[in-house]
A protein has these predicted regions:
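Sec-dependent signal peptide cleavage junction
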Residues: 15-27, 412-420
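Surface-exposed loop/turn motifs in large extracellular/passenger domains
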Residues: 40, 57-70, 84-99, 106-126, ...
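A cross-kingdom C-terminal cell-surface attachment/processing module
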Residues: 419-441
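Sec-dependent, cleavable N-terminal signal peptides
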Residues: 1-23, 443-444
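C-terminal low-complexity, Ser/Thr- and acidic/Pro-rich disordered "stalk" regions positioned immediately N-terminal
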Residues: 380-416
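Disulfide-bonded cysteine-rich modules in secreted/extracellular proteins
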Residues: 26-37, 233, 309, 334-344, ...
Length: 444
């Protein structure tokens, strides 16, 4: 029996080790240096392939699956995009799509085209953008979208020219969705004509660098459900049209805000930003959200922020301050309750909340004009303006007879129960009011 079990386990392990190679389509066509056009079917990149005939181009109407095999790298022909999609493209695998030329993208998704990214790293390994006014002689978006793109977990998009004397992107954005200037779309030498909006859905992945990590531009529609976004230059998300953020982690380690929102008009630059969830961290003293003017306010219904965002909280949505020096702001009833339940002190700065299962020792401070219940107790009003601390429970006492005799000939003592207090480490970033950015949007 033991031998049979060992054999079965060995077979299971072998299947697991082979599963990656089995995932490769044996009928897939190998992409070579001279491959230029992809028609219906499956293709695979193995090893390092530098294109010589031009961009790897998906034909209009074609349904193509492109696998980036482990360790593979697809590099552009000088002066060309690496991949141009005019059809329906799905990319899988763990390899890399790179672009090393000025003004060229690793992936260019044309108007009307659809791309689904299920894996791979997309890079500009010679990115040299030095500042908003200096492209360093080699800069562009890593991905440019005029069609529809869905990004799923397992994808990495970056601008990392540091190994080649470059930068992580300070001139061009990393991922651009929509038109830079839709008023000139379709004109000779300009961006393609606008027939339908550019749609970008991000379900996960890692996005690093760029002047703006994700730029939602003219006629762009952006939805972010999850992902990790890091920026050191300007903003993690820059929006001028329609953006909905439902989750993800966003970090800005430079001297600007995590999010930026601006409205230009009611047609293609609506400046509509809705934030339902996510964690947004800027440097100490830097606002998490910056807006161009009062017409550009986002609508915040959830999330955790490193600065005060109550001015953007939709309607009566509650907001609480917590963490060291109350530098973290939590938005939404359920999120605030979770923080207090985890053992954090909170100050309710806006709205009405009902907190339940808050452990002993936690202090809740009701702000002016708020209505706050803690474990069923109404602490609203001036009586608790300095805070209400949840008292220790009287505990539960029960007697259990025992015949056990201890070494000192005494019986076992009664037992008591004391609910412990969970510890939670909050964000420790100091909030600061944002300075409105009123200049015309920088290229990218």
């Amino acid at each position: 029996m033991k031998k049979a079990l060992a054999t079965i386990l060995a077979l299971v392990m072998a299947i697991g080790l082979c599963s990656v190679s089995w995932a490769t389509d044996p009928a897939a066509t190998q992409v070579t240096e001279t491959t230029e056009v992809l028609d219906n079917g499956s293709y695979i990149v193995n090893g390092e392939v530098t294109l010589t005939g031009g961009a790897l181009t998906v034909k209009p109407g074609a349904a193509v699956t492109l696998e980036l095999a482990a360790g593979s790298k697809l590099t552009n022909k000088a002066g060309s995009h690496t991949i141009i999609n005019n059809g329906n493209l799905t990319i899988t695998g763990t390899g890399t799509v790179d672009n090393v030329s000025h003004g060229c993208a690793a992936l260019y998704n044309a108007p009307g085209a659809t791309a689904t990214l299920n894996g791979g790293t997309f890079d500009r390994s010679h990115e040299a953008g030095a500042s908003t006014g200096n492209n360093g002689g080699n800069s562009y978006y890593t991905i440019k979208n005029f069609g529809t793109i869905t990004v799923n977990p397992g994808v990495t998009v970056q601008q990392d020219g540091t190994a080649n004397g470059g930068t992580t992107g300070k001139y061009s954005s990393l991922f651009a969705n929509g038109w830079y200037d839709i008023t000139t779309a379709g004109q000779p030498g300009k961006e393609p004509a606008h027939s339908s909006d550019a749609v970008l859905v991000i379900n996960g992945g890692t996005f690093k660098g760029g002047l703006n990590t994700v730029k939602n531009d003219d006629a762009g529609k952006l939805t972010i459900n999850d992902g990790t976004f890091t920026n050191i230059a300007q903003h993690a998300v820059f929006n001028v049209n329609e953006a909905t953020i439902k989750g993800g982690n966003y970090t800005m380690s430079g001297n600007d805000s995590v999010l930026y929102n601006r409205k230009y008009d009611d047609a293609n630059d609506k400046g509509q930003m809705t934030i339902e969830n996510g964690v947004f961290k800027a440097k100490d003293g830097v606002p998490a959200i910056k807006i161009a003017d009062e017409n550009s306010k986002p609508s915040v219904t959830g999330g955790t922020f490193s600065s005060d965002v109550r001015a953007y909280a939709a309607g009566d949505t509650p907001v609480a301050a917590t963490g060291e020096q109350e530098g973290t702001y939590v938005v939404g009833q359920s999120a605030i309750n979770a923080v207090a339940k985890a053992g954090n002190n909170v100050r309710i700065v806006k709205g009405n909340v009902t907190l339940t299962d808050v452990p002993a020792g936690v202090t809740v401070i009701p702000g002016e004009g708020t209505v706050v219940f803690v474990n069923g107790k109404d602490i609203s009003g001036n009586q608790y303006s300095d805070g209400y601390t949840v008292p220790q429970s009287s505990g539960y006492y029960y007697y259990q007879p025992t015949t056990d005799t201890k070494t000192d000939n005494t019986k076992g003592s009664p037992k008591t129960f004391d609910a412990g207090i969970a510890l939670y480490v909050g964000m420790a970033l100091t909030s600061a009011a944002g300075v409105a950015f009123v200049g015309k949007k920088r290229e990218d």
